[in-house]
Amino acid sequence: VLGSRGSVIPLFRKQIEAGGPVTVTDPEMTRYFMTIPEASQLVLQAGAMGNGGEVFLLDMGEPVKIVDLAKNMIRLSGFEPDKDIRIEFTGLRPGEKLYEELLTAEEGTNTTTHKKIFEAALEDVNQEWLSREIDRFESCKSDLDVINVLQDIVPTYHPNHNV
């Protein structure tokens, strides 16, 4: 959300004011951006639509390359990227992703009465299976046991190696 705590824009602004460099994680990194008023309005509208138990997804628009955002902010500040102010690539930190993964219609979302709010098509959870998996977690004796159970349940899970 633009202007929120943790947003990259205030960081880039400070780095530009200091003469650089502007730090970008990776040249291919993308993120979605939305203004605080737009995000607030959509969250409130989704809340008003809900009856309980639904999962709503917001249309975040198109992803923006962070390096393009950095270059545009440098230009808008009256400088030339990589000439007046350098862009430095810092590399991914543990757990950080190049892009945000959002559900799409093909992956199970349904339209709602609002064109920017979608509802996730959730499958019923097998209560027997869930109970068994909770028991497995409760019997874990170490962090490594927890990681192993998680990897069994979620094959795409890759732990942070600092754990």
Regions found by a protein language model. Name each.
Residues 1-163:
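Strand-loop microenvironment adjacent to phosphate/nucleotide-handling motifs in alpha/beta enzyme folds
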